[in-house]
Amino acid sequence: LRDSNGDFYFLEVNPRVQVEHTVTEMITGTDLVSLGIRVASGEEIRLKQNDININGHAIQVRLNAENPVTLAPSPGKLWECHWPGGPGVRIDTHAYTGYDMPSSFDSLLAKLIVWAPSRDESIAKLKAALSETKLLGVDTLIPLHQAILSEDDFRKRNITIHYLEEHKNLL
């Protein structure tokens, strides 16, 4: 950050891989976590920007243990836990049947990422993957994600950071 006097201020460093790195991995076929571990262990990576090609479209949703209307945390035990699968479907999770979702920590249960050649195909694949996902025992954001994926403004890419405020009637 640079102020009106020309002085610079340091805001933050994220010495970690961002949660969204999975989208980059899906469209490039590059394992960023593996590369990070190799760099941290002193290995020289000979990968160049020109070696990385973008292919297709990926979408990630966070499957949080939250009420889909109020977004309030939903702690509890997962009585049933079934994750989707198939080509172009990735699930990154720590949750399992019997997992106790605590009330005092991050509500993330899993990241669901899909890849397909086009955005429309990715949306269709994500809708199918969400309908295949079964998480019983806590509320989740699955109904909200399903509503967003079917909503016209989202499908037409007419979205801003105010999307949820502007679409309070999704659920």
Regions found by a protein language model. Give the residues of each.
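ATP-dependent carboxylate activation and anion-phosphoryl transfer catalytic cores
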Residues: 1-171
